[in-house]
């Protein structure tokens, strides 16, 4: 399958239900599932290049895969929440649990691997630390430039731009603006940048272009401070130490969010993640360049 299929399901929340979209690649009845969860302001099409490479490599090995890339609620093809206070990791975790249960009902899941970029990795750590709540425990966990302890400077930078920007007169103007905001993504060709970021925008009724996500996702950062970040880090650290899944940590060598010190600490506790640092990249590696994709394929497809 060279293009994904868009599906939707309904997830419960404290105000009722909301609809979540997800992009599915590969064979819908494959028992090996890879769940790819995006970063804070991103959406499931971020993983297009990785999905194609992973499916091609699996086919060479004679293996069947089902890749699922959700649009976390408030983003992309998913609903916006009526209560913005629900834009937080526990809501997202519950939605992923619902999604996995639905996928398992469609076709039994024998193995579950998780690829999580930034926020998607936080959700992944929460899920992997509570395997009893999943239809299948996370077997392999790939954390893309994220960990239990995050730099306040990096979070403050994200806080400064999330929910800001636009509308734009054209799609190209929006994509160009993102190239400045997201310089940490590292070097990309113009074509790569367009493919990666065109799904970040939608055209409004008046013809201008706006971000695909609900600006209210920024409210989760309103009360965030250096002190609350430290408190949250302690909670996440305790959860990280409960994880038993085979874990690979990718870190952009220039990352503001995940310090080298914190990344090294992750190799010495909990699942004892294997660390790979990627030169010339900050937060976060986009998994588009071949040197970023290759370690992911090696990790997910090894026997």
Q: Regions from the language model: what does each represent?
A:
Residues 109-152:
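Conserved hydrolase catalytic core segment
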Residues 26-80:
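Conserved HGGG/HGGXW glycine-rich cap/lid loop of the alpha/beta-hydrolase fold
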Residues 14-16, 49, 55, 66-115, ...:
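Active-site loop/oxyanion-hole signature of alpha/beta-hydrolase fold enzymes
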Residues 281-291:
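Catalytic histidine-centered segment of alpha/beta-hydrolase-like enzymes
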Residues 205-265:
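Conserved serine/cysteine hydrolase catalytic core
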Residues 169-223:
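Conserved alpha/beta-hydrolase catalytic His-Asp/Glu region
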Residues 15-25:
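A short loop-to-beta-strand scaffold at the N-terminal edge of the catalytic core in hydrolase folds
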Residues 269-283:
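Catalytic histidine neighborhood in serine/cysteine hydrolases
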């Amino acid at each position: 399958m060279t293009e994904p299929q868009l599906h939707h399901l309904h997830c419960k929340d404290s105000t009722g239900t909301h609809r979540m979209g997800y992009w599915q690649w590969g064979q819908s009845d494959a028992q090996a599932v890879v769940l790819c969860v995006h970063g804070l302001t991103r959406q499931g099409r971020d993983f297009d290049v990785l999905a194609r490479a992973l499916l091609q490599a699996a086919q060479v090995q004679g293996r069947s895969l089902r890749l699922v890339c959700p649009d976390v609620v408030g983003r992309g093809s998913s609903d916006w929440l009526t209560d913005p206070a629900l834009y937080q990791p526990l809501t997202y975790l519950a939605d992923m649990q619902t999604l996995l249960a639905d996928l398992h009902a469609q076709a039994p899941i024998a193995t579950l691997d998780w690829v999580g970029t930034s926020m998607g990795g936080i959700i992944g750590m929460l899920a992997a630390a509570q395997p009893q709540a999943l239809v299948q425990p996370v077997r392999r966990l790939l954390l893309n430039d994220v960990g239990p302890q995050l730099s306040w400077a990096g979070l403050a930078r994200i806080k400064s731009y999330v929910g800001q920007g636009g509308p734009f007169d054209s799609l190209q103007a929006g994509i160009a603006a993102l190239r400045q905001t997201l310089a940490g993504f590292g070097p990309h060709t113009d074509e790569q940048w367009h493919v990666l970021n065109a799904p970040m925008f939608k055209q409004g009724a008046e013809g201008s272009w706006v971000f695909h996500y609900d600006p209210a996702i920024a409210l989760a950062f309103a009360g965030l401070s250096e002190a609350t970040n430290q408190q949250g880090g302690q909670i996440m650290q305790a959860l990280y130490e409960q994880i038993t899944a085979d874990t690979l940590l990718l870190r952009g060598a220039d990352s503001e969010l995940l310090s080298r010190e914190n990344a090294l600490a992750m190799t010495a506790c909990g699942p004892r993640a294997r660390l790979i640092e990627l030169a010339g990249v900050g937060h976060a590696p986009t998994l588009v360049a071949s040197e970023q994709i290759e370690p992911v394929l090696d990790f997910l497809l090894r026997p």
